[in-house]
């Protein structure tokens, strides 16, 4: 529970319970829990059976999962062998996003530093804990969404007889945050992705159909710039601006956002933040160690052209449908009531409860900190006597008033006297 950056986890009746209102889907709990109490939820490949025309959207992090592979084409071939009718690489859309980001960064009057919107966990974290930075978020759809839009357009163009509802887009995700993003959307925006499966599931399925000793029939349609998005720093280097910062790992992300909010990040134009360690290669729905996957991605890039995707000639603007309809609203974690007066009263009560607690953050109550426990008490989700330390003190004080000695203290006294 203590590892959760938004204190969304409580231990109730011996089980870990997640507060969905606070959860940002960072996956830290999945990665650190030795008992595997929590796991990511995602669809299986069978969910694509309801579509007549199936499109795979492989995230670039998928390419770093396979050892001894020197050509991405074999992975593309393998996806076709799994039954997909088309493969649209998210790395291809990432190259377009890189180009559009350069255009956006040149827009006069935008608020800087611009914070990438590629990681759903980061954008949700900002909307909950750093509301003053919401206007710094780049209002552009992430590569996954643009890839889904372009893939469906390509399918309709190639097969005019297909109805839109017959076309299914399956994103191969390295993390649970993108699963939640597809389910819930971004603000008022509804995702163009239909199904999300885990990288791990596709990895094991591909092992059975890939043929590395045969000449691949399909070619990779992305370049080094797009594939580099798989690891931290790849997005930043693609915008050709030296005034950037790239950080990964949720704890580092929180520190950077704190610094930006406090005005300590002057002189920077672009901020790339990835909740997963090492970037998307470190997602909890992957298979390979993120550092090994990052090294493989770096090796694969050597065989690729710089880029294979760019805006159409003469297109010096970002298409309107590549922007979010609206930015996420402020959703404070500690809002105790919709009524301002009642909320202030409850906040004062929470501070009063917090002052009465020992302040040692032992976690015995099931909350990650004494402040979190005080909030639970005010919300009616816990009782003050759930704090073991406070309860023992209360019993001790009560016994003292009654001129009694608690049994355990009496035993200690006898031992010391002897």
Locate each region found by the language model:
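Helix-enriched interaction subdomains in cytosolic or periplasmic regions
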Residues: 1-34, 127-131, 136, 140
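Iron-sulfur-associated redox domains of electron-transfer enzymes in respiratory
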Residues: 40-363, 368-418
